[in-house]
Amino acid sequence: MQSNDENIYFPANQYVNAGQYSPLQQSFSQNSQYDLFDGFAEFGFLEQVPATNMYSGSQSTQMEQNYLPNVNNSTRKRKAPGQNEQATVKRRQIGIEKWRLPSRSVVQPSADISDLRRPPISYVALCALACRNAPDMKITPAGVYAFVLHHWRYYRYANENWKNSVRHQLSSKEHFDEETFQPDPSNPTVRRKFYIVKNPNMIRQNLISDADFDFFRKDSRGIEFYQKMFAGQIGLPRSLFYQIIGNGIPFLAGPENSSMFYQLLGMGKVVGYLETRYFREHYRSEHAATEPKYEEDYANFTEKIPSNAENLMSYGAATERNFQKFDFTDEEIELFHLNISSYHSVQKTCKECNLPNWCTPSVGDVETYVFGRQVPMPVNTPVILQQFETVAEQEGIRNNPLEERKTTEDPRDISILEALA
């Protein structure tokens, strides 16, 4: 892992360094009018900024010259100037300044998904399971979308008509009650809806069919995974990742990429515009169901969201007091995705010890327990892992506090420590 102090803050046209990006790094041609897709409107996460095109100008950027296909403007619909200009302005930029997404028309998945089939689980069951795992068992449609994308890979590539089915089930009032709330107390004109499942203790009896149960038993994650869902022990995926990346580029959704996103943030690394070399398409199998349950309040991302990542609590949390900005090498990115179960096990270990930043393990922990490197214990290493080292030496255990990872049958989830043994 390398320190990267000098490359964190840079202009938009310097986000790409030659030879470092995957084929997903595509953007707009010189004259293309970029906009974000309407799906973000549901999050209240759009920031009103001046109507400027970050790639406008008489000369194309280095990114465009080296990496980008030409986008035929004649095939893209544009809003007429004048009264519709404000509607375009509202979709210029989302979230934190450096985190922008392209139009889906120019970012396409590279995976061969011809063998993917829709899981035979009803939409009402999907909604009920998402609701059961939400705080206070209240959920927004956007929360259901994130939950579905997080746990079932098919929907990351499917036509987004499935979201209409989700909204229909939530609003049918047959199985769900509706509750209005105000996400921003300073703006009473903006109101959104929570949905609450009726008779939450009867979800299995009332909303889960025999076909659903048959699917649960055959799922590679096992019936135990779904039993945790019924009990509300899975939780919802962390929202910032989905509001910035997961819902905008759905084929990059999932626990692996979400974990990478937050670890980078904790290392002081802001994922720049179209900088997707850190993320992978996990389409060959469902995730390993090793992720801990995160306890998050409902995110209130409005026009007042901080414009800088430094204002987020998790920014720099992985470096603690000895703050430096770090980055992952290409090899480390591959190891992170390959060994994601060990990363989640480190999180669980830290959570059990009530460490305040357990969601974002320290740089030293990732080096040692995820990448499997024998490095000196850094000053900022959590006390629990320092104590483990002492116990390990006494009992003859070597760098393996994470026994649960051995239960997996997927060789991709074996710790790099075991692989190198």
Swiss-Prot record:
Residues 118-218 bind DNA. One of its GO terms (biological process) is cell differentiation. Gene3D superfamilies: Winged helix-like DNA-binding domain superfamily/Winged helix DNA-binding domain (1.10.10.10). Disruption phenotype: RNAi-mediated knockdown causes significant reduction in the expression of 21U-RNAs, upon simultaneous knockdown of fkh-3 and fkh-5. CDD domains: FH_FOX (cd00059). GO terms for molecular function: DNA-binding transcription factor activity, RNA polymerase II-specific; RNA polymerase II cis-regulatory region sequence-specific DNA binding. Pfam families: Forkhead. InterPro entries: Fork_head_dom (IPR001766), FOX_domain-containing (IPR050211), TF_fork_head_CS_2 (IPR030456), WH-like_DNA-bd_sf (IPR036388), WH_DNA-bd_sf (IPR036390). Signal peptide: none annotated. It is found in: Nucleus. This is Forkhead box protein fkh-4. It comes from Caenorhabditis elegans.
